[in-house]
Curated annotation (Swiss-Prot):
This is UDP-N-acetylmuramate--L-alanine ligase. One of its GO terms (molecular function) is ATP binding. The keyword 4Fe-4S does not apply. Keywords: ATP-binding, Cell cycle, Cell division, Cell shape, Cell wall biogenesis/degradation, Cytoplasm, Ligase, Nucleotide-binding, Peptidoglycan synthesis. HAMAP family: MurC. One of its GO terms (biological process) is cell division. One of its GO terms (cellular component) is cytoplasm. The lineage of its organism: Bacteria, Pseudomonadati, Pseudomonadota, Betaproteobacteria, Burkholderiales. The gene is murC.
C-alpha cells in the first residue's frame, strides 16, 4: 500500500474507532491528517505523534491526501467527502482500512454485541505478557498502554470487529471471537434478528481453513449458530460443554477468583482484576486464544491479575466527597444497552455488597430507547436511586414516546425507583450532590456526553481537598 498511498486523511479522527487506526498508521510511517469537531485527549495524542489535526470539516483539510477514511457516522454531504469525490481521491470505509492493516499481520478479530472492547483489551494484554508483542486497535483506552492502539513487532493484530453496521464482514482474520449476539443496531439488518445471526455466520466464513472461531457457548444465540459454522470452533464459558470452562467462581475484593478447565491441560487458578461474571467470560476468550498460541500459563495468570482495565469500562474514579459529609465510590461505564447495564450493575453489587447503588444514566439513541423500552425500565428499576437525563440523540430525530420524560414516567409507574429527571448532562453533578450519601456506590453510565461527568466530579473533589 505504501508505494502508492503515502498520505491518509481521517474524517472524524478523534473517534474511538478511527483514532486507533490512525495511530498505527502514523507509527508505520504514513503521513496522517484528520479532522474533528473538537479537540480532545485523543487528538492531542495523535498530534504529538506527528499527525496533523484540523478542527472543523473543510474541503481544504484533505489537500495532498491519497486516501480519505470515513466511518459510517460521517454524512455523505460532509465537505471533505464531497471534495474527495470531486478530486477522485479514494474514500475508504474505516473497516476496509482496518482490513488492510490486518493483511500486514495475522488478525484476531473480536466480535459480539457486548464486551468487545474489554475482551479485545484482555486478549492484547495476555498476548503481550506472553511475549508476542501484538499490535492492537481497541475502542477504548487500555490503561496499561495509555492508548487505544499500539504498533507491536509481533505477528498478530488484535482488533474489534463491528457488527453495528455489518462492517465486520470486511475483515479476514485467522482467529475470531464471538462474545454474544443480541438485538442492537437492528436497523442495519432490517429489524430481522435472523439476518443478524446470519451475518455472524458469514463472519466466520471469512476464516481460513487453519483459522478458528472462539465462541461463548453460554449465549443462547451463539449456541444456535455453532452447528452452522464450517470452521473449527473453540467453545468457552460456564457451560458443561465448554472446552475452556470457568469453575468455582468467587467474587472477592472487586476481583473474580476462578479455576479454568481446559481439555488435556491441568486446572488453572486465575485471579481476574475485574468484577463481574461477564468479565470472567471475557477473560475465558483471552485464555482460549492464549492457550492456542502456546502462551505460558504463568503469563496468562500474571496478565489477568494485573489487568488495569479500559477507559469507561467499570472505570474507578476513587472516593468523591459527598455533599452531606463522607464520601462515595465513583465508577464510570460505557454501558448503553440493557444487557450491558444489567451486567455492570450485577458486577457492582458483587464488588460492593450491601452498599447503596446510585445510577446516573444517559440513554443513547431514541431508536434504541424505543426498541428496548421495557428492558430499560426493568434494569433501571434494580438500582437504589436514579438520576436520568434526556436521551443523547447521536444524530437521530426525537421520538416523544421514547424520550427521557417517557422513560421517567414508566419508571414511576413501575414503582420500584423514583427517578430524578434532568434535561441535560450538565445538571447531573448537582443532582448527584443532593442524592449521593456517604458509603454509596455511584455509577455514571451511557455512551454519550455523560462520559465527561466523572472527571468533573473527581476534579471538584481534588479542588475541595
Amino acid at each position: 500500500m505504501k508505494h502508492i498511498v503515502k498520505h491518509i486523511h481521517f474524517v472524524g479522527i478523534g473517534g474511538a474507532g478511527m483514532s486507533g487506526i490512525a495511530e498505527v498508521l502514523v507509527n508505520l510511517g504514513y503521513q496522517v491528517s484528520g479532522s474533528d469537531l473538537a479537540r480532545n485527549a485523543v487528538t492531542e495524542r495523535l498530534e504529538a505523534l506527528g499527525a496533523r489535526v484540523s478542527i472543523g470539516h473543510d474541503a481544504a483539510n484533505i489537500e495532498g491526501a491519497n486516501a480519505v477514511v470515513v466511518s459510517t457516522a460521517v454524512r455523505s454531504d460532509n465537505p471533505e467527502v464531497l471534495a474527495a469525490r470531486r478530486l477522485r481521491v479514494p474514500i475508504v470505509p474505516r473497516a476496509v482500512m482496518l482490513a488492510e492493516l490486518m493483511r500486514l499481520k495475522q488478525g484476531i478479530a473480536i466480535a459480539g454485541t457486548h464486551g468487545k472492547t474489554t475482551t479485545t483489551s484482555l486478549v492484547a494484554s495476555v498476548l503481550a505478557a506472553g511475549g508476542l508483542d501484538p499490535t492492537f486497535v481497541i475502542g477504548g483506552r487500555l490503561t496499561s498502554a495509555g492508548a487505544n492502539a499500539r504498533l507491536g513487532m509481533g505477528d498478530f493484530i488484535v482488533a474489534e470487529a463491528d457488527e453495528s453496521d455489518a462492517s465486520f464482514l470486511n475483515l479476514y482474520p485467522v482467529i475470531e471471537v464471538i462474545t454474544n449476539i443480541d438485538a442492537d443496531h437492528m436497523d442495519t439488518y432490517g429489524h430481522d434478528f435472523a439476518r443478524l445471526k446470519q451475518a455472524f455466520i458469514e463472519f466466520t466464513q471469512r476464516l481460513p481453513f487453519y483459522g478458528s472461531a472462539v465462541v461463548c457457548i453460554d449465549d443462547a444465540n451463539v449456541r444456535q449458530i455453532v452447528p452452522l459454522i464450517s470452521k473449527p470452533v473453540v467453545r468457552y464459558g460456564f457451560a458443561a460443554d465448554a472446552q475452556v470452562r470457568a469453575e468455582n467462581v468467587e467474587a472477592r475484593d472487586g476481583r473474580m477468583h476462578f479455576t479454568v478447565r481446559r481439555e488435556g491441560r491441568e486446572p488453572l487458578p486465575v485471579v481476574l482484576n475485574l468484577p463481574g461474571l461477564h468479565n470472567v467470560q471475557n477473560a475465558l476468550a483471552a485464555i482460549a486464544i492464549a492457550t492456542d498460541l502456546d502462551v505460558a500459563d504463568a503469563a496468562i495468570q500474571q496478565a489477568l491479575a494485573e489487568f488495569n482495565g479500559v477507559g469507561r469500562r467499570f472505570q474507578r474514579y476513587g472516593e468523591i466527597a459527598a455533599a452531606g459529609g463522607g464520601a462515595y465510590t465513583l465508577i464510570d461505564d460505557y454501558g448503553h444497552h440493557p444487557v450491558e447495564m444489567a451486567a455492570t450493575i450485577a458486577a457492582a453489587r458483587g464488588a460492593f455488597p450491601g452498599r447503596r447503588l446510585v445510577l446516573a444514566f444517559q440513554p443513547h439513541r431514541y431508536t434504541r430507547t424505543r426498541d428496548c423500552f421495557d428492558d430499560f425500565v426493568n434494569v433501571l428499576s434494580t438500582v437504589d436511586a436514579l438520576v436520568l437525563t434526556e436521551v443523547y440523540a447521536a444524530g437521530e430525530a426525537p421520538i416523544s414516546t421514547a424520550n427521557g420524560d417517557a422513560l421517567s414516567r414508566a419508571l414511576r409507574a413501575a414503582g420500584k425507583v423514583e427517578p430524578v429527571f434532568v434535561a441535560t448532562v450538565d445538571e447531573v453533578p448537582d443532582a448527584l450532590a443532593k442524592l449521593a450519601r456517604d458509603g454509596d456506590v455511584v455509577i455514571t453510565m451511557g455512551a454519550g456526553s455523560i462520559g465527561g461527568v466523572p472527571g468533573k466530579l473527581a476534579q471538584d473533589t481534588q479542588q475541595k481537598g
